[in-house]
Design a protein with these regions (language model features):
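Catalytic nucleophile loop
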Residues: 2-3
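Catalytic active-site module of serine/aspartate enzymes centered on a nucleophile-bearing elbow/loop
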Residues: 154, 158-194
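Alpha/beta-hydrolase-fold enzymes
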Residues: 6-92
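Conserved alpha/beta-hydrolase "acid-adjacent" motif
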Residues: 136-146
Length: 194
């Protein structure tokens, strides 16, 4: 979710940045996101905006484990089972968003389809997109590539990307985290001319 908020930030305040690293993002079908947002609105009529809907949560995350061998519903996050277990044990991670939170998230994601909004990203802002090629959020790189293409179509020209074989969503705690951190450090050194 953070990568979607980061991309929205780039559209509004990218001119305040010297660069950005976007990790684990995607570009879900617009109709799907719009339908999910509409569902939140309908459910809120009956249950209120503070309701925590398991239906919306399941629709948002249910298919993420598809095609993966896993012990838990959160295995899509990481190949490192110890990290998955830490995530599952953390009450700050294992909660259901309110309808209002989902609605706000879907509204923000829908803004990322608007060329006028994307035009706010500075054309020369250095961007690095990192993703695991087994990350379901990025549709195993297809969604990440669409996100990059949308920015290029908006005239943003300084975009680099790297996809990690077998890696899933949480790259900073993946089994290849040393490689990820080295790539981040290398990109930052290049951008900062160190």
């Amino acid at each position: 979710m953070g990568s979607f908020y980061a991309r929205q930030y780039l559209c509004e305040w990218g001119d305040e940045l010297d660069g950005a690293i976007i990790m684990g993002t995607g570009f879900q079908p617009k109709a799907l996101v719009a339908t999910a947002r509409a569902l939140c609105r309908v459910l809120a009529v009956f249950f209120g905006w503070e309701h925590r809907s398991k239906l919306v949560a399941n629709l948002s995350f249910l298919g993420y484990n598809r095609g993966l061998e896993g012990r838990t519903p959160q295995d899509w996050l990481n190949r490192d089972q110890a990290e998955v277990d830490k995530y599952r044990a953390d009450e700050r991670c294992m909660f259901t968003f309110t309808l209002n939170a989902y609605y706000s998230m879907f509204t923000g994601i829908l803004r990322l389809y608007d060329p006028a909004v994307l035009a706010g990203v500075p054309k020369d802002l250095p961007l690095l997109f990192l993703a695991g090629d087994a990350d379901p959020v990025g549709e195993r790189t297809a969604g990440v590539r669409r996100a990059i293409r949308s920015l290029r179509d908006a005239g943003v020209g300084n975009i680099e990307s790297k996809f990690y074989p077998g890696a899933r969503h949480e790259l900073l705690v993946e089994t290849n985290k040393a490689e990820v951190f080295a790539d981040i450090a290398g990109w930052l050194e290049k951008q900062l001319h160190l």
